[in-house]
Each structure stands twice: as C-alpha cells, then as structure tokens.
Amino acid sequence: MSLVHMNVIVAFTLSLVGLLMYRSHLMSALLCMEGMMLSLFVLAALTILNSHFTLASMMPIILLVFAACEAAIGLALLVTISNTYGTDYVQNLNLLQC
C-alpha cells in the first residue's frame, strides 16, 4: 500500500473519529461527513487510476455529486434548525417529542 493511500485512509479515519467525538454541533458533524466523502472520492479516483479500470471512471464523479447533494441538504437543515431553535446543538433536536 502506497503512502498516498495511507494518507487518504488516515484522513477518512480522522473524519470518522471527529464525527464520533465532536457531535454536539450540527455544523461540525456536517464538516466531518464532508471530509469523509472527500477522502472516499480521492480513494476511489486513485484506485481507478492505479487499476486502469476505465468502465468505473464515472464512479468518483457520481460520488462527488452525491456529496454535493448531501452538503446542500445538510446546510438547508442547518439553516432551518438555526432559525427554529436558535442554536445548532444536536442534543436539542429530539424528534420523538410532539
């Protein structure tokens, strides 16, 4: 395994640890998930470039499109929650309350 692959895997792991540890604010959770998606994009692009598998060359672009959609929906939810509750604390968002 090359050094570039190891760096991408470390970036994914750090984003996952950040998501698990710092989940008090919605904005930090969204940033950690965006870091995970970008590291998956780089890993998929590197894997396809190293294996010369041209049929799967659209997969990183599709993954990037889904990451952009996820970011847009997450930011829309963040704006809605900030306007409704005044904060972006995740623990205040209990969906089971009426």
Curated annotation (Swiss-Prot):
Coiled coil: none annotated. It is found in: Mitochondrion inner membrane. It catalyses: a ubiquinone + NADH + 5 H(+)(in) = a ubiquinol + NAD(+) + 4 H(+)(out). It is an enzyme of class 7 (translocase). Keywords: Electron transport, Membrane, Mitochondrion, Mitochondrion inner membrane, NAD, Respiratory chain, Translocase, Transmembrane, Transmembrane helix, Transport, Ubiquinone. One of its GO terms (molecular function) is NADH dehydrogenase (ubiquinone) activity. The keyword Membrane applies. InterPro entries: NADH_UbQ_OxRdtase_chain4L/K, NUOK/Mnh_C1-like. GO terms for cellular component: mitochondrial inner membrane; respiratory chain complex I. Its EC number is 7.1.1.2. The chain crosses the membrane at residues 1-21, 29-49, 61-81. It is a multi-pass membrane protein. Pfam families: Oxidored_q2. One of its GO terms (biological process) is ATP synthesis coupled electron transport. It comes from the Eukaryota. Belongs to the complex I subunit 4L family. Core subunit of respiratory chain NADH dehydrogenase (Complex I) which is composed of 45 different subunits. Core subunit of the mitochondrial membrane respiratory chain NADH dehydrogenase (Complex I) which catalyzes electron transfer from NADH through the respiratory chain, using ubiquinone as an electron acceptor. Part of the enzyme membrane arm which is embedded in the lipid bilayer and involved in proton translocation. This is NADH-ubiquinone oxidoreductase chain 4L. It comes from Ziphius cavirostris.
